[in-house]
Swiss-Prot record:
Membrane topology value: Single-pass membrane protein
Main location: plastid
Chain positions listed as propeptide in the UniProt record: 1-8
BP-aspect Gene Ontology terms: photosynthesis
Subcellular location: Plastid, Cyanelle thylakoid membrane
Plastid recorded as keyword: yes
Name of encoding gene: psbK
Subunit record text: PSII is composed of 1 copy each of membrane proteins PsbA, PsbB, PsbC, PsbD, PsbE, PsbF, PsbH, PsbI, PsbJ, PsbK, PsbL, PsbM, PsbT, PsbX, PsbY, PsbZ, Psb30/Ycf12, at least 3 peripheral proteins of the oxygen-evolving complex and a large number of cofactors. It forms dimeric complexes.
Signal peptide interval: none
Natural source organism: Cyanophora paradoxa
Lineage: Eukaryota, Glaucocystophyceae, Cyanophoraceae, Cyanophora
Function: One of the components of the core complex of photosystem II (PSII). PSII is a light-driven water:plastoquinone oxidoreductase that uses light energy to abstract electrons from H(2)O, generating O(2) and a proton gradient subsequently used for ATP formation. It consists of a core antenna complex that captures photons, and an electron transfer chain that converts photonic excitation into a charge separation.
Protein name stated in the entry: Photosystem II reaction center protein K
Parts of the chain that traverse the membrane: 23-43
Family statement drawn from the similarity comment of this UniProt entry: Belongs to the PsbK family.
């Protein structure tokens, strides 16, 4: 009972993190872009 009550409150507790969760899938794309820019900066050696 206590566990189900805790789980029921989780969505409200995590509502604060929704913007972060929306951004998370984009982060690997930033790493790919960073790698490309880094290679361009050193001249694709």
């Amino acid at each position: 009972m206590l566990m189900s009550l805790f789980l029921a409150k989780l969505p409200a507790a995590y509502a604060l993190f929704d913007p972060i969760v929306d951004i998370l899938p984009i982060i690997p794309l930033f790493f790919l872009l960073l790698a490309f820019v880094w290679q361009a900066a050193i001249g694709f050696k």
